[in-house]
Amino acid sequence: PWSFQNPVALVFDEYDAGRSDVMFVLQRILESDGYFTLLDRNKVVKQNSYFRLFATANTIGLGDTTGLYTGTQQINQAQLDRWEIVTSLNYLSSDNEMNIVLAKNKQLNNIKGKERVSNMIKVASLTRKGFVSGDISTVMSPRTVLNWCNNSEIFKDVGYAFRVTFLNKCDNSEKNIIAEY
């Protein structure tokens, strides 16, 4: 109730992994009239006019039919209807991804390091295109690129780091396709 009554931006990460009993409580918060009843306290609280609620979901609330996001649930259509704005985010541009990787790996912020990171991002982009086209079933996220960079620093071997960070997660039948990237 505290966040609801204050100028807070509340973010529910992996919203579609929420339990249905919790989701029904949240449904009332999504109503536009700005009131919420605390039954255990016999009290009605009013929403702060600057309170904002955000959520992230890999399945956009439609559930997972692919098996990629095990543990997610289909969100009740009435609740999905209460979200006034729903949007999709694509992957970052190569430049933005580069900036994030370099910010987390300052030792790579030099000509040689930038070239290595640029090549890693190109490989990641190829896996994303392969995933979208249905050629491969595992995608390299920006988090995976960060892990690949970290592991390449640990092992001092970009190829080995690629295998332990990404390739070992892939289906054996797809490894030849990935090798072409």
Regions from the PLM with identified roles:
Residues 1-181:
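C-terminal regulatory/interaction module of P-loop NTP-utilizing enzymes
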